[in-house]
Amino acid sequence: MGNLCVDVITLFPEMFSAITEYGITSRAVKQGLLQVTCWNPRDYTTDRHHTVDDRPFGGGPGMVMKIKPLEDALVSARQATGAAAKVIYLSPQGRKLTQQAVKGLAEQESLILIAGRYEGIDERFIEAHVDEEWSIGDYVLSGGELPAMVLIDAVTRLLPGALGHVDSAEEDSFTDGLLDCPHYTRPEVYADQRVPDVLLSGNHAHIRRWRMKQSLGRTFERRADLLESRSLSGEEKKLLEEYLRERDDS
């Protein structure tokens, strides 16, 4: 896992300034850990209207992105990035993007992301060029740009040196298959609500157990499906039982 080069084929390259100019991803760009290059299919059209879409065969509403501009943009991206780059189409028909999937993508040296628009892109382009399809959820967006940015952000967090603290990525939600524990900062008391005493104790073993217990309890209450695919250790089972007992007694 090292530096990452991401090429994005998109009709709206300006949107990706959110990645290159703000936050952790911007810092990764400045550090040379992340490179983001956009390729606009409109730049590969030959008509005066720069047409990139057409009516779907068989009728129906909406328009479909044409093959040729996409294919020509992909050729340019491949030449710049390297033929080995994995081509990913952000699509509601794709597999759901999980933290485990993000870890796998972070192992790549280069990615080419296809951000579709309208009713989608010509299926023949997908069959000929796309290696993987990924979805960020079971809902409809106006295009693939936001999912592409989500993927870039998630992968960037796993690049060595991208985060301010070496342990930050390891402690994120989903990293070990669980939701994150609650976090607190100063002041110790706000509107009669106190920070849990254990976090002020300085006892790192107790703090670790408390955080694990809260993480397990939160996951059980909010995303029990995550626990179904995870084998709990003896300590984790005991902590979850403690959490549920304390919850029921309160």
Curated annotation (Swiss-Prot):
Keywords: Cytoplasm, Methyltransferase, S-adenosyl-L-methionine, Transferase, tRNA processing. It is an enzyme of class 2 (transferase). It is found in: Cytoplasm. InterPro entries: Alpha/beta_knot_MTases (IPR029028), tRNA_m1G_MeTrfase_C_sf (IPR023148), tRNA_m1G_MeTrfase_TrmD (IPR002649), tRNA_m1G_MTases_N (IPR029026), tRNA_MeTrfase_TRMD/TRM10 (IPR016009). Specifically methylates guanosine-37 in various tRNAs. NCBIfam families: PRK00026.1 (NF000648), trmD (TIGR00088). Belongs to the RNA methyltransferase TrmD family. This is tRNA (guanine-N(1)-)-methyltransferase.
